[in-house]
């Protein structure tokens, strides 16, 4: 899922993977960016943040006008959009475009956006990812991130490498810690044991 904010860490991580020259996997059978698919699963149209949908429309992955509530008299269960983009948006709402003269420019990002018509909870979203898209894409590794999660630098690459280097590995998780923000506003609140819990 996506929480509505641009993820510069994701752009940097994707760029690092695409520019990786050491690995046979990333340089075999086509460009590295073609081996990565970002799949966004949103749990229901009504609870979805409209600003997030606007952001996704800006980068090209979402089109409001093509959705139908029903098809041939049957209620729509999910709306699926697929797009490859090289656009991104910063937290300050600035559009970032690729620059051919810059090696740190944005590589293409293949995206699938699954917008469920109704809120049917997290397990149903996981089913869409694994049973729906996973069967078609047949990925080597899936990394799940909840909305609002901000991975550290190189953390996605470290997870991928763990799976790639150990074929017996079935699952892994990263370390989670609270980000207290600037100015200690949240830090002061954590002094209250009820809030901290």
UniProtKB/Swiss-Prot annotation:
Catalyses which reaction(s): [(1->4)-N-acetyl-beta-D-glucosaminyl](n) + UDP-N-acetyl-alpha-D-glucosamine = [(1->4)-N-acetyl-beta-D-glucosaminyl](n+1) + UDP + H(+)
Signal peptide: none
Domain of life: Eukaryota
Single GO MF annotation: chitin synthase activity
Keyword set, alphabetical order: Cell membrane, Cell wall biogenesis/degradation, Glycosyltransferase, Membrane, Transferase, Transmembrane
Top enzyme class: transferase
Subcellular location, record wording: Cell membrane
Cross-referenced Pfam families: Chitin_synth_1 (PF01644)
Entry membrane topology: Multi-pass membrane protein
Disulfide bonds: none
InterPro entries: Chitin_synth, Chitin_synth_fun
Spans traversing the lipid bilayer: none
GO biological process, one term: cell wall organization
Keyword hit for Coiled coil: no
Function: Polymerizes chitin, a structural polymer of the cell wall and septum, by transferring the sugar moiety of UDP-GlcNAc to the non-reducing end of the growing chitin polymer.
Annotated protein name in UniProt: Chitin synthase 3
Organism whose genome encodes this protein: Exophiala jeanselmei (Dematiaceous fungus)
Encoding gene (name): CHS3
